[in-house]
C-alpha cells in the first residue's frame, strides 16, 4: 500500500471506531495535516449523524466547512468526546511529536479538552525513541533568539522555520538532533522557557489510542 492509502485506511478506521458512539449532539475534535484531512473526508460521509466539529487550525476549519460540517469555537463546547489527529512520530507509549504543520498549540489545547485522543498514522511514524523528526516549538517572535539559546542548552539544534507564521501569529523553531528519552520531562522543560508558547511533544497528555496503518492492515495500540 502507498502512504496515501495507509492514511486513508487509518482515517476510515477512526471513523468506524467513533461512529457508533456519536449522536446528534456529539462534537468531534479534529486535528491538522494530511492524515487529518483524510479523516475529515471520511467523516463527512456521515455528517448527518453528529452535531459538528472543533477545528485545531484555520485550514481544518475551512475543510470541515467545505464539507458542510458545522464548526464550533472550543470555548462554546462543554463536552468533547473524541479528538482525532495525526502525528509526526509516536513511541510505544503513545507519546508523540506533532507540529510539522505548525498547528501544535491549538492541537494541544483541543487534545487537552477531549476525553479520548485517537492518533492516526502510518507505520513509518512509530519509532523506538522520539527525536529523529525535528521537534517544533512555537515561540513569541521577540523571544526567538533567547529561546534558541535555551534550547541549545538542552542539547538541541534549533532552526528557525522561515516564512511560517502560526494561526496565533507566532513563529516556529524546529529542534534537531535530540534523542528524547524522557518526553514528559523535556516537554515541561521547554515549556518553562520564557517566550515559548508550547512545544510539539504530546507526552503530559499522550494519545489514548494509536491506529497504525501497516501493509497487513490497521493495528490498534493503546497507552
From Swiss-Prot:
It catalyses: aldehydo-D-ribose 5-phosphate = D-ribulose 5-phosphate. The active site is at 107 (proton acceptor). Coiled coil: none annotated. Its EC number is 5.3.1.6. The keyword Isomerase applies. It is an enzyme of class 5 (isomerase). Keywords: Isomerase. Pathway: Carbohydrate degradation; pentose phosphate pathway; D-ribose 5-phosphate from D-ribulose 5-phosphate (non-oxidative stage): step 1/1. The keyword Isomerase applies. One of its GO terms (cellular component) is cytosol. Gene3D superfamilies: 3.30.70.260, 3.40.50.1360. InterPro entries: NagB/RpiA_transferase-like, Ribose5P_isomerase_typA_subgr, Ribose5P_isomerase_type_A. GO terms for molecular function: ribose-5-phosphate isomerase activity. Substrate binds at residues 32-35, 85-88, 98-101, 125. PANTHER family: RIBOSE-5-PHOSPHATE ISOMERASE. Catalyzes the reversible conversion of ribose-5-phosphate to ribulose 5-phosphate. Belongs to the ribose 5-phosphate isomerase family. This is Ribose-5-phosphate isomerase A. It comes from Pseudomonas fluorescens (strain ATCC BAA-477 / NRRL B-23932 / Pf-5). The gene is rpiA.
Amino acid at each position: 500500500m502507498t502512504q496515501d492509502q495507509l492514511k486513508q485506511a487509518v482515517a476510515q478506521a477512526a471513523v468506524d471506531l467513533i461512529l457508533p458512539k456519536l449522536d446528534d449532539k456529539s462534537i468531534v475534535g479534529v486535528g491538522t495535516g494530511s492524515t487529518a484531512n483524510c479523516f475529515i473526508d471520511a467523516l463527512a460521509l456521515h455528517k448527518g449523524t453528529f452535531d459538528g466539529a472543533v477545528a485545531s487550525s484555520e485550514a481544518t476549519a475551512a475543510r470541515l466547512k467545505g464539507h458542510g460540517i458545522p464548526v464550533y469555537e472550543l470555548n462554546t463546547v462543554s463536552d468533547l468526546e473524541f479528538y482525532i489527529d495525526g502525528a509526526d512520530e509516536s513511541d510505544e507509549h503513545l507519546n508523540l511529536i506533532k507540529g510539522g504543520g505548525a498547528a501544535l498549540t491549538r492541537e494541544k489545547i483541543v487534545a487537552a479538552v477531549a476525553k479520548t485522543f485517537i492518533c492516526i498514522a502510518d507505520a513509518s511514524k512509530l519509532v523506538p525513541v522520539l527525536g529523529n523528526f525535528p521537534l517544533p516549538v512555537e515561540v513569541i517572535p521577540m523571544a526567538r533568539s533567547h529561546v534558541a539559546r535555551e534550547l541549545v542548552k538542552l542539547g538541541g539544534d534549533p532552526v528557525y522555520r522561515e516564512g511560517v507564521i502560526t494561526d496565533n501569529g507566532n513563529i516556529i523553531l524546529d529542534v534537531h538532533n535530540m534523542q528524547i528519552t524522557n518526553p514528559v520531562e523535556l516537554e515541561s522543560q521547554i515549556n518553562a522557557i520564557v517566550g515559548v508558547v508550547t512545544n510539539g511533544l504530546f507526552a503530559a497528555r499522550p494519545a489514548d489510542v494509536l491506529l497504525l496503518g501497516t501493509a497487513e492492515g490497521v493495528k490498534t495500540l493503546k497507552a
